[in-house]
Amino acid sequence: MRVVVVYKYESDHAREVLDYMRDFSRSTGHKIEEVDPDTPSGAHFCRTYDIVEYPTMIALDSSGRMQQMWRGRPLPTISEVSFYA
């Protein structure tokens, strides 16, 4: 499984997301993938999973099926997300 966070790099929530990813990595040893919705590949990812609110975290299985999605703030707890990492 993998966890992806979709957020706009130039936004008011970017610092919060970066801090969360750093804390998540330190706590679990796993990385969260980043997607910028302003890039062509990021826009395609957002259309695929119907992501319209930022930040959004999404847990995907190995075949790309969505397992869980957390939209907006507050961000989910590290323990909630670590189950899927």
Question: For each of these PLM feature ranges, what is it?
Answer:
Residues 19-21, 48-49, 73:
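Short, glycine/charged-enriched secondary-structure capping and boundary segments
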Residues 1-28:
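Local sequence-structure signature of Cys/Sec-based thiol-disulfide redox active-site neighborhoods
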Residues 41-49:
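N-terminal beta-loop-helix "entrance" segment that forms/cooperates
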